[in-house]
Amino acid sequence: MSRRNPCKFEIRGHCLNGKRCHFSHNYFEWPPHALLVRQNFMLNRILKSMDKSIDTLSEISGAAELDRTEEYALGVVGVLESYIGSINNITKQSACVAMSKLLTELNSDDIKKLRDNEELNSPKIRVYNTVISYIESNRKNNKQTIHLLKRLPADVLKKTIKNTLDIHKSITINNPKESTVSDTNDHAKNNDTT
């Protein structure tokens, strides 16, 4: 009985050729180095899927790519408003990435000022505290915040986005001269060129 060479697709995961594949899929026939390569590959795959610091969204679906068409066409706020209104076919992951970008633009000190102006028993205080906690979480690890937002049920996520957008609008109305993160970056680039 002749030993065939191990299937290179089977070593790196799974062979999709079925019966058409002329290489060996029987692990008992494989030499030890081929088994070690397969074992190492599978263990790395498991480790990668368990690692929360890796943004699997960007690898699988391109969710963290800069040239996403929805965000380019609608802007961050437009993507979030479209998701709330269930228009323009905005996916949950696109909304979560846009929400993370909006959280980076918000300043928790401004929200704390709004919170301090409310009455003690106002239900808005809880909303402000929730948004502040998301801002702090996003500042520490924005990829983990995207995962947390994605785990929320759709109705809860929409309510959270709506509350955050309302706070964002009230801050921009109260402080119209306040520059956003993107404006600050543009000013820094202009200063470098002069």
UniProtKB/Swiss-Prot annotation:
Residue ranges, annotated region (Oligomerization): 32-49
Intrachain S-S bonds: none
Main subcellular location: virion
One CC-aspect GO term: host cell nucleus
Region (Globular core): 76-171
PTM comment: Phosphorylated by host in infected cells. Only dephosphorylated M2-1 is competent for viral mRNA binding. Cyclic turnover of phosphorylation-dephosphorylation of M2-1 is required for efficient viral transcription.
Composition skew (Basic and acidic residues), residue ranges: 184-194
GO MF annotation list: RNA binding; structural molecule activity; zinc ion binding
GO BP, sorted A to Z: regulation of viral transcription; symbiont-mediated activation of host NF-kappaB cascade; transcription antitermination; viral transcription
Region (Binding to the phosphoprotein): 126-163
Mutagenesis / variant outcome for changing L148A: Loss of M2-1 association with inclusion bodies. No effect on of RNA-binding
Range of residues in the leader sequence: none
Record function comment: Acts as a tetrameric transcription processivity factor that binds in a competitive manner to RNA and the phosphoprotein (P) to prevent premature termination during transcription. Transcription anti-terminator that enhances readthrough of intergenic junctions during viral transcription. Preferentially binds to poly(A)-rich sequences. Plays a role in the association of the matrix protein with the nucleocapsid, which initiates assembly and budding. Also, can activate host NF-kappa-B through association with host RELA.
Name of this chain's protein: Protein M2-1
Organism from which the protein derives: Human respiratory syncytial virus A (strain A2)
Upper lineage: Viruses, Riboviria, Orthornavirae, Negarnaviricota, Haploviricotina
